[in-house]
Amino acid sequence: MIWKRHMTLEALNATSVGTMVEHLGIVYTRLGDDLLEATMPVDTRTHQPFGLLHGGASAALAETLGSMAGYLTTRDGQCVVGTEISASHHRAVSQGQVRGVCQPLHLGRQSQCWEIVIYDEQGRRCCTSRLSTAILG
């Protein structure tokens, strides 16, 4: 297990209250030994003007997952900040919900790199994102 902080899904979701994460409807759904998952609705909150999932919403889901996963790997007195994010969009989604799965590519003492893959309800890859973070403290 890679996590140094121990939080329940309920506690993880409580951190979203009053934030953009809550506004977008992002909900943490699974905390595995080396992965963190969340869902996000594809609706008017996350659509672009043509009725498809906005690429920025996908990036927000990816950064939410990567940042929280990074935080969970740190000790008291440390925090994680994002330094770079990329997102490759593979497939359009117009309704339902998407599921993001975040796993580490690199866990160093001062930096981390996370891969976040976003799937549609049929399990098809819609977006592949990579988030780099720095550990402070």
Swiss-Prot record:
Active site: E63
Compartment(s) where it occurs, according to its Swiss-Prot or TrEMBL record: Cytoplasm
Enzyme's top EC category: hydrolase
Swiss-Prot/TrEMBL keywords: Cytoplasm, Hydrolase
Gene Ontology terms for molecular function: 1,4-dihydroxy-2-naphthoyl-CoA thioesterase activity
Record bears the keyword Hydrolase: yes
GO biological process: enterobactin biosynthetic process
Name used for this protein in its record: Proofreading thioesterase EntH
UniProt keyword Cell membrane present: no
Gene expressing this chain: entH
Coiled-coil regions listed: none
Listed GO CC annotations: cytosol
One Pfam short name: 4HBT
Record field: transmembrane: none
Purpose of the protein: Required for optimal enterobactin synthesis. Acts as a proofreading enzyme that prevents EntB misacylation by hydrolyzing the thioester bound existing between EntB and wrongly charged molecules.
Subunit record text: Homotetramer. Dimer of dimers. Interacts specifically with the aryl carrier protein (ArCP) domain of EntB.
HAMAP family, alphabetized: Thioesterase_EntH (MF_00907)
Enzyme Commission number, as recorded: 3.1.2.-
Disulfide bond annotation, renumbered to this chain: none
Annotated metabolic or biological route of this protein: Siderophore biosynthesis; enterobactin biosynthesis
Family from the record: Belongs to the thioesterase PaaI family.
Location (main, coarse): cytoplasm
Organism of derivation: Cronobacter sakazakii (strain ATCC BAA-894) (Enterobacter sakazakii)
